[in-house]
Amino acid sequence: DIVYIYKTESGPMRMSSRVGLRSPLYCTGVGKAILATLPGDELEDIWTHSNVQKLTDKTITDLEELRSQLVEVRANGYAIDDEENELGVRCVAVAIPGADGRAESAFSISGLAPYMTPERIRRIATLALDARTDILADLGLR
């Protein structure tokens, strides 16, 4: 699971996530960003010990489909939650890898699905990747 440790809201709309809430790795942007940094055998172990369930009609419940998405996450550098955890919400997330390349933390930017167009997702992803570079530099990891 992931645990939300900080959250900032903007505007009157509220997402269901809140500080302290636990959510599954397999259907959240930050979860998928973290999973993409793990070796395949660890991913399989996590999957096997997870209570995988369909939270929305878009939730991934097939390990091979998740593996396929994680290949994209590694290639792009960011993960997308496309209404998999909460209907009407899309999320862009990037992991913060440690010195060994494995991530134990990540951050995300979420918005209402109609406003999170492919173009906006690309712009947000670019900003998030730039922020990750700055964070890693501040931590002395890059």
Please tell me what each predicted stretch does.
Residues S17, S108-S110, L136:
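Short linear Ser/Thr-Pro motifs
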Residues T61-A131:
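Extended hydrophobic
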Residues Y4-Y6, Y26, Y78, C91:
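Aromatic side chains
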Residues Y4, M15, T117-E119:
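Short acidic, gly/pro-rich beta-turn/loop elements at beta-sheet edges
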Residues I5-S10, T37, H49, I109-L112:
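Generic beta-structure capping elements
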Residues P12-N85:
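Short, solvent-exposed recognition segments
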Residues D1-S10, R123-R142:
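Intrinsically disordered, low-complexity terminal regulatory regions
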